[in-house]
């Protein structure tokens, strides 16, 4: 009996890609009758997602829907989510991949960095390392936060509003330093407001916290995870260079109304409105993003938090009430850097 040979890295990559492609075809068949090509297109649309968590995995799904022939690689810290990523049609690899990994020698025309700062001691350094995988031809997108904007007295805020000075806040410093690394290299930045979906976000925190030392009338700016992902896809596809985009639904809502709307939706059992005890403090910002919308041709599916809780019934693909035709992969992991 002959000895079986161990699979080479190339064979392993091919097998994983074949599995990912089969999953992609099955997903496509359940949602569309359009033909799906499985191999690279003449203009390469391959994408590397650094940090394919809740946001990054949604970007990967959106990119594959837009460019079915693309190869999408998801780079993670561990292999815990790799099986789930494969089910989405994504080829997974760990950050510290072996030198003989089948993807080790290549760069990508499109890269999105969506890993949160909480997962790294040297966040700007992590972003700089990710830039080495970009070939400069398509677009590199870094997902930052609207928390970098300095105005918090309730006034208007858009893409070009002033940001904090370096040295004001260590949390913001990490983001602004990482942004500069990206912009100087020709990449683009998507500053995202507070991210949420039916089971994650400020509303979930409010509903489980009886007393909050904050103002009920302070403004919060939000964007649904699905809309943040579609914004990133639009930014990538635009091939923009050294641009700053702002992700927000453009309809700020008070903390008190976030709790009120969530309770009135009826989607959260035994939900009780928290007591907001503060009467002083920052009022927040009133954010709009006209330049982002016009330059990318983008608008949010969930036009406001109120609309999500009322017109949409707090129902999205993350909701326990959602009944997909196929099993779904719902990554968890660290929360993304929250804007406001």
Give each language-model segment a name:
Residues 37, 229-283, 322-340:
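Mid/C-terminal beta-alpha module of Rossmann-like enzyme folds, strongest
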Residues 46-51:
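Conserved N-terminal Rossmann-fold NAD(P)-binding element of oxidoreductases
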Residues 56-57:
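N-terminal Rossmann-fold NAD(P) dinucleotide-binding loop
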Residues 106-142, 177:
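NAD(P)-cofactor binding segment of oxidoreductase domains
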Residues 128-170:
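Conserved Rossmann-fold NAD(P)-dependent oxidoreductase catalytic core, especially the SDR/UDP-sugar
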Residues 179-199:
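Conserved beta-loop-beta element that borders a ligand/cofactor-binding pocket
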Residues 204-212, 218-245:
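Alpha-helical substrate-binding/gating segment
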Residues 280-340:
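C-terminal amphipathic/interface module of NAD(P)-dependent oxidoreductases
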